[in-house]
């Protein structure tokens, strides 16, 4: 079990609810490049669906749809699956920082704090996927130590599955 209050030293982290939908939508809209690559626009309906969407084999209690708050302002959103696709792996379904904070290193600091806590919680690796056609995502996740390990087709285009090991003795796959 994750201790979400330990995921950041600078931000208050809590589970997001439907009451947060408007703030989440505003944060998503501040990242138009991401949605341009998806070929869609963010919507309240999509956000509500994302709050409960699970990969095959994951249980609702494995999902953490979290917000990072600076005061009352939502600064970042994290969709994390505990123990997917294996018990020792955490899966990041979405990590998005308010576009107004872009380029300030906030996202990288939040990711590093997240990875530290996941390692403390016993995870040996973190997986995620991003669009191959999105150079911004490629630069960001590579800069944060994630290595692409495979390509997968997706309705939004080819996705790169990437892994970051939290223990040096593990194989990245």
Regions found by a protein language model. Give the residues of each.
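Active-site acidic-Proline motif in GNAT/NAT acetyltransferases
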Residues: 98-100, 104, 132-133
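Residues forming the Rossmann-fold NAD(P)(H) cofactor-binding site
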Residues: 108
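Conserved GNAT acetyl-CoA-binding A-motif
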Residues: 118-129
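Conserved beta-strand-loop-alpha-helix junction that forms the acyl-donor binding cleft
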Residues: 128-138, 155-159
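Conserved acetyl-CoA-binding loop of GNAT-fold acetyltransferases
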Residues: 142-150
């Amino acid at each position: 079990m994750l201790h979400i209050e330990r995921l950041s030293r600078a931000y208050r982290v809590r589970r997001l609810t439907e009451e947060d939908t408007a703030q989440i939508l505003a944060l998503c809209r501040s990242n138009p490049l991401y949605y341009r690559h998806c070929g869609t626009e963010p919507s309240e309906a999509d956000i509500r669906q994302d709050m409960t969407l699970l990969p095959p084999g994951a249980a609702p209690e494995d999902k953490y749809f979290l917000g990072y708050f600076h005061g009352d302002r939502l600064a970042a959103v994290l969709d994390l699956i505990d123990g997917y696709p294996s018990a020792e792996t955490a899966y990041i379904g979405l990590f998005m920082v308010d576009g107004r904070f872009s380029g300030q290193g906030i996202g990288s600091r939040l990711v590093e704090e997240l990875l530290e806590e996941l390692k403390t919680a016993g995870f040996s690796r973190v997986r995620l996927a991003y669009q191959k056609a999105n150079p911004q995502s490629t630069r960001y996740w590579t800069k944060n130590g994630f290595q692409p390990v495979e390509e997968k087709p997706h309705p939004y285009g080819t996705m790169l599955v990437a892994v970051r090991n939290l223990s040096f003795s593990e194989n990245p796959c």
